[in-house]
Swiss-Prot record:
A helical hairpin is formed by residues 25-137 which is conserved in all known ESCRT-III proteins. Helix 5N-5C (residues 193-217) contacts the helical hairpin 3 subunits away and is essential for oligomerization. The C-terminal flexible linker and alpha-helix 6 (residues 220-256) are not required for oligomerization and do not resolve in electron microscopy. InterPro entries: PspA_VIPP1. GO terms for cellular component: plasma membrane. It is a peripheral membrane protein. The keyword Cell membrane applies. This is Membrane-associated protein Vipp1. Its main location: membrane. GO terms for molecular function: lipid binding.
Length: 258
């Protein structure tokens, strides 16, 4: 396939169709870009050569026009001098350059059309290369994203979500148990302290009640006269002491039973 046929094929191609049909779109685009860049180099060389040929044809055409004008003037000059034969030769030379000029003009028109076509193809090829590079970068980004999503989905599928949730629930249950245990220990510590103070208060009440009971059991005090005082040698009757001791023993037994 010639250069111009390849360029025509590339310029008229649809990159989206090429990508969709390719087994490896990224590799296909990379190869297409390389081929288009090679074609671009050749096309630029071809455009440069065509422009150079066009310039040569333009110069030859202009030179032929100058010769036509020159021999036209020479023919007129010969006629003015009365030399008709010389004028005829000048006109024959003019005709030769006129034929050459016509051929050069036709060739120049064809070259101009070809150069314009090559320039358009060059612009389109550069645009295709830019489009291919952009699609390549977009495709690479999509491939990277797709691979990341696939990897993430694989990780999610590999995870046992129910087992993980059960583990979290067990951890939460342990934390709640520890919190409840700490709260219960705090309440017990407070209860023990209150019990100790209650025992202290209760002990004080018992002591007070015992003292009051003793005071009630003592005989009331009566005025003592000198006549009523027993002799110094006498002591308190033993019977009164026995009664008090018996009552105290009874009281102790009652307290022990509490």
């Amino acid at each position: 396939m010639g250069l111009f046929d390849r360029i025509k094929r590339v310029v008229s191609s649809n990159l989206n169709d090429l990508v969709n049909k390719a087994e490896d779109p990224e590799k296909m685009l990379e190869q297409a870009i390389l081929e288009m860049q090679e074609d671009l180099v050749q096309l630029r060389q071809g455009v440069a050569q065509a422009i150079a040929a066009q310039k040569r044809s333009e110069k030859q055409y202009n030179d032929a026009q100058n010769e036509i004008n020159k021999w036209q003037r020479n023919a007129q000059l010969a006629l003015q001098k009365g030399d008709e034969n010389l004028a005829r030769q000048a006109l024959e030379r003019k005709k030769t350059y006129t034929d050459t000029s016509a051929a050069l003009k036709a060739s120049l028109d064809t070259q101009s059309t070809q150069v314009e076509t090559l320039k358009r193809n060059l612009i389109q090829l550069e645009s295709k290369i830019s489009e291919a590079k952009t699609k390549k970068e977009m495709l690479k980004a999509r491939i990277t994203t797709a691979k990341a999503q696939e990897q993430l989905q694989g990780m999610v599928r590999g995870m046992n979500t129910s087992s993980a949730m059960s583990a979290f629930e067990r951890m939460e249950e342990k934390v709640l148990m520890q919190e409840s245990r700490a709260q219960a220990l705090g309440e017990l510590a407070g209860a023990d302290l209150e019990t100790q103070f209650a025992q202290l208060e209760g002990g004080s009440d018992v002591d007070d009640e015992l003292a009051a009971l003793k005071a009630q059991m003592l005989p009331p005090a009566t005025p003592v006269t000198q006549a009523q005082l027993p002799p110094q040698q006498e002591t308190t009757p033993a019977k009164s002491n026995e009664v008090v001791d018996a009552e105290l023993d009874s009281l102790r037994k009652q307290l022990d039973q509490l």
